[in-house]
Amino acid sequence: NFRSALPDGETHHQYRAASDGQLGGIMKLYREWQISGDHQWLARMYPLAKKSLNYCIRSWDPRGKGVLEEPHHNTYDIEFWGPDGMCSSIYIGALSAMAHMARDLNRPEDAEDYRSLAEGGAEFLDKHLYNGEYYDQKVTYRGLRDTSFAKFVKRVNRKSGEVDKLL
């Protein structure tokens, strides 16, 4: 498949990281630390997890809302444009996990930054995506750093009423 090479080796693609997989890795790190209680292991792994999470923040939440807004790939092998309940809830979980790990490692600034983002994200989901029954996706392509979809939409024939329903 395009994500791994068999036999083991370099993959030759330019695909984006899967947001749910990337963020799920941080939650798995937290789980393994909770099960093992190995603080030395956590201290070794934390800088790598921080690098991974900061990549996610820069790439998908550059405005610091606590939700993934920029186009983000996922393990369904599609791109989500705009905030969605699925990947954003995993993001909030990863932020919360990092806040707990940072606090345990006596990194209060990191803990507060991640906690604040997670709290803001949870509030955003409830306010903007919850429809009283479930969390919806808010498809967004305007006002993002990635303008490729907005440029594509400008070329779409708008004479069809169905197109307006989709956009």
Predicted regions and their residues:
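Aromatic-rich carbohydrate-recognition surfaces in CAZymes
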Residues: 1-64, 82-102, 115-118, 122
